[in-house]
Curated annotation (Swiss-Prot):
This protein's name: 7-cyano-7-deazaguanine synthase
Species whose genome carries this gene: Streptococcus thermophilus (strain ATCC BAA-250 / LMG 18311)
Enzyme kind, highest EC tier: ligase
Taxonomy of the source species: Bacteria, Bacillati, Bacillota, Bacilli, Lactobacillales
InterPro entries: QueC, Rossmann-like_a/b/a_fold
Function: Catalyzes the ATP-dependent conversion of 7-carboxy-7-deazaguanine (CDG) to 7-cyano-7-deazaguanine (preQ(0)).
Residues binding Zn(2+): 185, 194, 197, 200
Names of the cofactor(s): Zn(2+)
Keywords: ATP-binding, Ligase, Metal-binding, Nucleotide-binding, Queuosine biosynthesis, Zinc
């Protein structure tokens, strides 16, 4: 039995698009919310809009440009991507998931939606503290207390590695769609990406592992 409605935090990338198709399977009504936070590649927002339109879903785009004004990182500033071993990579945007989920919750309540779906994942941990299960559970409690509302933050990818995320997309009938139409690349290249940035490496490594396990490599 499908639940009534869900709001998906949506960037147009592999993970959030997989979550979109997961939500379509589990909910009667699905809406999307995308945040414009000053990211270097505004193409991300256009990709999200295009996918939302193709799927016939209501799509909210919220202006969070202030975040790009108060943080300096490789996703909002023109600086080289760095990832030192044992340190948080400079692609981490301080407060991003905290703020995104908080604003998504405000929107969800106004829309009469309880379930918020996000593609954060702890298994392929990239050093991002706001992708941890403990953070999401803590914020869920805080949001419920703050707004006297029974939100449920759904994290269908939390314990999946990238190969398993590809497998889920395949199970949902969305493998080719996710592979060809999503934007994960930090350098703004749709689909296969640049092949050089950390996001592309993680995505491609997971894809190769999944195809090898499936016997399609």
């Amino acid at each position: 039995m499908k639940r009534q409605s869900a709001l998906v935090v949506f960037s147009g990338g592999q993970d959030s698009t997989t979550c979109l198709f997961w939500a379509l399977k589990h909910y009667e009504t699905v809406e999307l919310v995308t945040f414009a936070y000053g990211q270097r590649h505004s193409l991300e927002i256009e990709v999200a809009k295009e996918i939302a339109q193709e799927q016939g879903l209501k799509h909210h785009v919220l202006d969070m440009s202030l975040l790009g004004q108060i943080t300096e990182n490789a996703l909002t500033s023109d600086i080289e991507i760095e990832a030192e071993k044992g340190e948080v990579p400079n692609t981490f945007v301080d407060g991003r998931n905290h703020l995104f989920l908080s604003f998504a919750a405000v929107l969800a309540k106004q829309r009469g939606i309880i379930d918020i779906v996000t593609g954060v994942c702890e298994t392929d941990f990239s050093g991002y503290p706001d992708c941890r299960d403990v953070f999401v559970k803590s914020l869920n409690v805080t949001l419920n207390l703050a707004m006297a509302y029974d939100f449920v933050i759904q994290t269908p990818l939390m314990w999946l590695d990238k190969a398993e995320t590809w497998a889920l997309a395949d199970q949902l009938g969305a493998f080719d769609y996710v592979r060809e139409k999503t934007l994960t690349c930090y350098n703004g290249i749709i689909g296969t990406g640049c092949g050089d940035c950390p996001a592309c490496h993680l995505r491609q490594k997971g894809l190769e592992k999944y195809l090898a396990e499936k016997g399609d490599a």
